[in-house]
Amino acid sequence: MAQQQQQQHQQQQHHQQQQQQLQQQQQLLQYNNNSYNLNYNMEDPERRKRREREKYERQQGIQSDDRETSLFGEPRRLNPNEGDPEITAALGDFVDARDYMNASTVGIYRQAPGASNARLQALPKGFGSATTSFSSSSSASASSSASVPGQLPTSQQQQQQQQQQQQQHYQQQQRAPTYLKQADNKPPYNGRGGYPGQPMKNDIPSSSGMAPPRGPPRSSSSSSSSNNNSSSVSNNATAAPTSASTSSPLGPPMSTQMPNGREKSFLGPPAPALPNGGRFVPPSASGKRPSSTAGLQPPPPENHINKIITEMTNNYRVTPLTSIAATPHAPMRENYNLNGPNKFKYAFDAVDPIGPLNSPPAAGASSLMTPLLAPIAPITSPIAPLLTTPPQASQLPLPLPPMAGATTVPPSMAMGAVAPMQQLTPTPPKASPTPPVIKPLKTEKNHSLEKQDSCLENDLELSESDDERKKDSRSAGNSSNSSESDSSESGSEASSKGDPQQQQQQQQQHLLHQQQQHQQQQLLLQQQQQQRLAATANGSKKKYSQTIIASGANTISGLLTSSGLGGTGAGPGGAVNSTGSAAGGVGSGSGSTGGGSSSSGMGTMSSSNSSNKTPSPTDSNRWHLSRFFPKPANQTAAESVSPGVANAMGNVSMKVPGILPGGAQIIPESIDVTTAIVKNEKLHDDSRHMDDDEDEQADQQHQQQQQRYGVGLSVTVKKEQLEQQQQQQQQQQLLLQQQQLTAEQLALAGALPKNQIKRESRLSDSGSGSSGSGSSSSDSAGGSSEVLPMPGPGETLQIPGVPAAITTVMRVPPATQHKAQPNSVTLTPIGPLPASPKPRQKKPRKKKMSAATAPPLDSSDEDEPANSNKKHALELAATAAAAAANAAAASVMPVAAAAAAAAAPAIKKGRGRPRKQAQQQQQQLQLQQQQQQSGNLSSASASSSQAKGPTLTAAKKPLAKGTASSSSSSGTAATVAAGSRKREHSSNSSSNGNTPTKKPNAAMAAAAAAAAAAAAAAIAVRAASSSDEDSSSSSCSSTKSSNSNSSSSGSDTDIPTAAPAVTTAAAVAAAAAQNPAKKRIVKINKVGVASSKAKRRFSLGNSSNSSSSETEEQQQQFLQQQQQQQQQKQQLQQQQQQQPQQQQLQQHHQLQQQQQQQLLQGHFAPELPLQTLKQSAQQRLSSSDCSSSASSDSSSNSSASSSSDEDDAHRSGKRKSDKKKICTLTRIFNPKEGGAKKQGQVVIIDQSEEQLQQQQQQQQQQQQQQQQQQQQQQQQQQQQAKELKPRATPTQLLGATLASPARTTTPHLTSLMCKIDLSKLARQHHHQPERLKTQQNGHLSSRSAEGARTPKELQQIYAPNGYVGGALGGAAGAAAGNKLLGGVKHEHGVKPEPELDAGYEAKYKPNSVKQEFMLKQELPARRRKRSSSSSSSPYKEKKRKKEKAEQLSKELLPVPVLLPANNHERLSRDKLELLLQQQENSANASPNKLQQQNARQLPLSQSQLQHQHQHQHQLQQQQSQSTATGHAIASTTSATVATASTQLPTTCSEAVQTTPPPAAPPPAPRLIYRSHFDNEEEHASDDHRKNDLLLQEAIRRKRAADSERDSFNQMTLYLEAIVYFLLTADAMERCNMEATWTMYKDTLSLIKYISSKNRPYQQLTNGKHESHNIVAILSLRCQSLISLKLYKLRRANCRATIASCSEFFRSGRGDILNGNTPSSISPSNSVGSQGSGSNTPPGKIVPQDIHNQLCKQNEYLTYVNSAHELWDQADRLVRTGNHIDFIRKLDHENGPLTLHSTMHEVFRYVQAGLKTLRDAVSYPQSQ
């Protein structure tokens, strides 16, 4: 029956695919909306879910019992009715997955696995397809998971029974009854927590099968990851199979340890007690459905399943069964598990099931994909992986990724991906007959959504995560809700928090079950750490989602796929959720935290899904990676063999040997890291993995994926980062103990709080947690073995709580790390996207970070987006650099691997990065992580967001400075890096923490976090030194290979320097060994190379951007959180170590700073202010990581400056697209996306007292330094003046002029990206001259009306890529002329001023001025965003502006002294003051508005601006000679003027809220007001032929519009015809007034008619019709002007009429009607008089001529009234439609349209507006 119904349903679907898709999408939307509303507040999604679960328990306790009975009793789910095809499909999938999981893994039914295994295995193929489709419809899959138990009709019940029998031995491993909650008459959550003895109440008919999963099963339905964490449901029986497959021991401990007894009770007893076995109720987790269904009807469903899968992929692509299993699972766990441990459950189950799931893993919703691969492996090795991928949408990047991505993506995306799924699906179904079952399950799934009230509620809980994920993914800015991350992540958090011991047990059991090796155990420990991080990820949930959202739809899909969002929260669908939960939960079976990747990879991944960690999605993505798909299919047996190992290596088909034999160090670690994989990173990385990983790099890629994902995810959450640091410290401690910790490591992993793991799962989303967990896991796999050899630092890093897995990795890489330090990319610390809650991804990663990076960052994330993207980009660059370095030195490979682990997210981000390099870097990162608790953060570029980035940056700067100094400082940096990375990676998260500024912060942060670094001081010094440089350079961007082979392109250049770097690395290693706690060895290879110096300068600028992007508050929070987490994680020892280390580091940095200042004063006077800044940062060190980075920055000022200069050259050579820059800047400052979001990357910390003191000190120092700098700058300017003409290339400019000024400026930026503190204002005041030049001019040029383009004047001077010639001069602080020409350098100049532009520019430091130039065009909106986003809150922004105004007022006083008081400078000062006042007045007032106003006023004629620019440039040169400040201000002023009419020198400073210094300098362009008489239009020619041509053109366009069918095109053609008619009428005006009148009047009638057709679109507020609104605005303007013109044409007549009428009324003539009048004039009077006439009212008789005149007067005056009324309507529409920016830009480019505008001006204005609209419609992305 079930098969027949399935066949019927398949036919129906074939006939009704579109309808079903629409219905399913609608249902999913509704379901998602409901779940989204339920989980709308992501602040306490777990609380809400817990309350809901408790509510379900109370309300449906009996119902759950009924449900169990009905689930098993009713086969109707399997046999879907026409009414419930979708529900049946969902349930069918769930049944298949459940049966399969029960049979292959520890079956819910405890039946001999043989009976159902074949079916389940067969099912996985079909089921995988179905799962993929379910992935697309997460809500549907969630309901299917809920309804699966109901669907377990006779056949399913039989399957379940068989599976129970088959899986009894598996369950014996899991011992579900042991974990099952004893029947205490306490109702389970709608049967989700159904107990074996309890009958399930089937209050929801469609979810009769789903009812049991309602509590935890929802999460279980969300994915097999739910299986672990919940799926706290009987699903643990189902999930237990998954977990059993991952690690049989883990499965039972999961259920037992589930914080919510329900899930455990569901897992254990249900299978033995009922046909459902109560377990079956848990199987309700969709993850199990496929196995149950598969077991039921393997062969017949096969064909049906193929069809069903295709249909389901089309219909449910967003929410495949896997998604349902995973997504409901994660939310269920969160809801069901009131405690954080639920996430751990996810991770645990994922780990345990992975091994057994091999082929069965498909049973798990998220692992459905895996089973598909396993069963399909022979037949559908290509297709199977693809099919496998879709269920885990998170793995979009893989070949299947499109499908998976579609699955992850919202319904529209799901529809897109479904088609490939369908194609792929049919093939896998052929491989396995069982797949057809999936189809009915899917059908049932939709039904469950529609029909099952209780089940729907459960599903809503499950689908809440899915829906919220979808919504979050849909709304890039809504990531904070991130229901996906919330549902799966919070679920994983609950599991990780509540079930730390369970996770430990599960992991221990999993390790025991696998008995693979240390590596697997280490992986588990790492996963646990990741789970801890996942717990830390509680805060990162929002950030995680935001990262994904910020990344964008593409990145969202990719990120979802990459971060295992498929299960967790790829908002798009249940598939994503299932993948996220399953993949995230398992994290690669080896690590509960990293489990997510396993679920996405394969059945093994489904096990990881059981782990149900939010980061597990990253793992699942990793598993879904192409290498995972083919290999898991091939490795079905291997995966089933060891769930954890299968996770680590099951998808590890490529890494099976490496993981299994090597202790799963390669794959399991990567999988673990994958658990923390950032959603955004996943998109980019998956494709990359598809390319590189399938072959050699499977193991490394697993590590890389885990690390990358972990990095990306960990970046998002600061707490996670702190926790990761602590976990890393524990891991480092374990490194010493790892050999002894084989059993202990499992215990340690279990001991790690699941909360931490949960946070890590979020971190995996955000990148920081996952990088922390991933780095730890990768460390255990890749470098723990070598780390042990490492001296004290590695040992110090060994934290008792850290998983032993790190030991394995650490052991191998230590020597390699030392070697790799110079060569290997120090990427690990860099990539700190998570610094601000992403984005996000979001916001995209810095565009400058790397070209390759930026594109992957497109979306997201990730998100994450922008920040996550930037971070990923940096990571990619670092990965490429690390790969190059690794290639150069094989011995360095381990260190490079650790760096790669950190850079892995970057590599994943950048599709161009080869995976091998990424893998090597990941290994290096792992080693570094093992060495340093901060190593985790540093190891993951994304993890740099963990505020660990500072170490990398700190290390990088010392390296840049010199080999000796870098080695000495790098030693300190290495230890400091551990602590500072955590802080700074969070700060660097947006800017990738690669920037030198970050590095100094890293040094200081390392001093603060030295405890972690102390343990791994030696190792950290070795691994971190190279990785620091690499990461910092990678953060700079792929182009910046200077500091290390951080970027692929940069790596090429750096490879030459890599050889010397290796030698220097040896010296650095020695230095590190000497003082590991004090220094981190930064890439020394660049020290001796001049070009490397330039690169260092560039990297410095980049790091400063990232550093400034991170706020001191964030850093402080990270430090505090890190310390707290360390205490919580029993890392007090390391904390103690860190504290002394921090103190030592601080002292050391201070000494270094002093020395460096002396050196800089001797060598580079301009750097002195930076040093002072660094000192001030050191003072702040306790308060923020920025201080540490600042101190380290001082040590590496000169080298970093030079490197940044060189990088600037590369950057200018490799110009990033202005659009990318703008996107990066916007995302960074977009509060929703990452940059300054929430805490705000550029948070102005009101450390007024400290800042005032620092400012005073800095001002004094800066004054001295400025004098020196001014002298140097004058000299340089003279040199540059010579070079001004040749300075065509930014590289040349950088090399020649950037030396000292760039360094000086760069150190500021490097010192504090986030520090927009008031102290910055004082600092900037001293440094303002240089900063103003670079920042204001650069910003102005970037923000000029041209936008990305450099102002025309600047272009004439030649400013490459929007480098303003004059403006850039200030940035370098050198000759204004030279720097003006060398825009790139001045960008560096801007970068060096993290405190000035910390909010705006520091974040975009990699993009630097280029981005700002780009911003100039998009100036209005982006500036606003940046200014507002730069400040964490409006209040802060207000406060900041007020302080800025005060400081500016103070600074302005000295500035006049410095500057010759010329009118222009006075005007600019006045303008700055005025702007500051305006900013103060409006807390949220964006500097954009002020700048725009300035731009409007500025647009004197370009000639005037040019003249002023030249004059100012001369003044600047003179002033620079006389005084640096004067020069800086003059250059800024000239740069502003040069920037073009829209020159807004203060724009950047204002928009970035660049503390008063940028605004304070007179560079602020003086307001230039446009005169109404300036552009008096010449009269049109009287040539009749020309007029005829105009008329013909108008008629031609009107006729074209008449035949146009597209509403927008029609409106634009009509409007063009109108303006041509207006030109014709204007030309006729001189010939025939009457004809002109007629023409205008007819034109007005025509335009009114056209406007009436456009009104319906105008009323629509959605973005689709935004263009229609703008057309309406232009139309209203034309109507107004035409009406006014008609009045003007009749003005004389109107005057005569008014005079005549006035005379009539004044004279009073006119007969008065009296009652005796025989007849009244009006018929009404006659009627009223009724023949007498006596009742007619009195009145005047108006003569006919007067009446006619009154009518004419009314007509004329109506024109006047209409003119003003229509104009006001247009203005209102501009404001209500949020089109101010568009109109403002149009006004700037074409002059404002006023009531005085001539028809020719109207013509130009409207034509320009329509052209811009068409471009926007044709190329929406470009807009």
Swiss-Prot record:
Residues 456-466 have a biased composition (Acidic residues). The keyword Nucleus applies. GO terms for cellular component: nucleus; super elongation complex. Coiled coil: none annotated. Residues 426-438, 1555-1565 have a biased composition (Pro residues). Residues 1-41, 126-147, 156-174, 205-249, 475-531, 599-612, 764-785, 877-906, 917-947, 962-979, 1002-1057, 1102-1161, 1182-1203, 1253-1280, 1497-1531, 1715-1735 have a biased composition (Low complexity). InterPro entries: AF4/FMR2, AF4/FMR2_CHD, HMGI/Y_DNA-bd_CS. The keyword Protein biosynthesis does not apply. PANTHER family: AF4/FMR2 FAMILY MEMBER (PTHR10528), AF4_FMR2 FAMILY MEMBER LILLI (PTHR10528:SF17). Belongs to the AF4 family. Has a role in transcriptional regulation. Acts in parallel with the Ras/MAPK and the PI3K/PKB pathways in the control of cell identity and cellular growth. Essential for regulation of the cytoskeleton and cell growth but not for cell proliferation or growth rate. Required specifically for the microtubule-based basal transport of lipid droplets. Plays a partially redundant function downstream of Raf in cell fate specification in the developing eye. Pair-rule protein that regulates embryonic cellularization, gastrulation and segmentation. This is AF4/FMR2 family member lilli. It comes from Drosophila virilis (Fruit fly).
